[in-house]
Each structure stands twice: as structure tokens, then as C-alpha cells.
Amino acid sequence: MSSPCLDRLAALSSAEEFFQVLDLPYAPEVLRVARLHILKRMGQYLATTSFAGLDDDAVRRAARDTLERAYRDFATSTPLAERVFKVLREHDPERPPARGAFVPLADILHPLTQS
């Protein structure tokens, strides 16, 4: 089920438009640094929100709340600390890199030495 509010949000193309349509104030310096991170986090929050049975005003309020929550995450933190995107999660200095598969050279040469 779709709502006019969600349809309108899906058609937006800039972070500023989301804030304008949902009538939320924002600091340009926060948005300049974290616009994609904020929208990605908003999408994560929206994905866990049920809109079933809500009228369009309630959907708009829920969308506004998720954008406000996502914005707050980055107004009080940084994209590096939040690690919303996969590339940042994979290169977390706090987490050791995953070890690749190791095959000893003897195991590779073993079939050759049995001829």
C-alpha cells in the first residue's frame, strides 16, 4: 500500500527537498557533510516502520520523525563513527580485517608429488 506522502518522498532528488517537504529545520553544515548518510539512515529507519492502516497525515509524521532521528544521529556524531555505508563498515579500524582463505603450498604441490 502506498500513500501520497511516500510517493512524493520517492520523487525527491536532494536532501534539502526532504527537509523542506517534511518541514524540518537543518544546519547546512551538517547536511553538507552527511547528506547521503542521513538519507541512508532515514531509509533504514523507514524500512522498519509499519505504515499499514495509517492515514497520509500519520505517514507524513512518521516520515518526519525518521528524518529527524536520522539527522540527529549525524548532528551529534560523524559519518565515520556511524558507518552507515558498507565501505565504511568494512574499513573500520576498530575491527580487524577478515582473514582470507589460507592454503598451504604443500597442499597445492601434494597432487604433483604423487605422480
From Swiss-Prot:
NCBIfam families: PRK00810.1. Homotrimer; associates with NifD. It holds the Pfam family NifW. InterPro entries: NifW (IPR004893). Belongs to the NifW family. The keyword Repressor does not apply. May protect the nitrogenase Fe-Mo protein from oxidative damage. It comes from Methylobacterium sp. (strain 4-46). One of its GO terms (biological process) is nitrogen fixation. This is Nitrogenase-stabilizing/protective protein NifW. The gene is nifW. Transmembrane segments: none annotated. Keywords: Nitrogen fixation. The keyword Kinase does not apply.
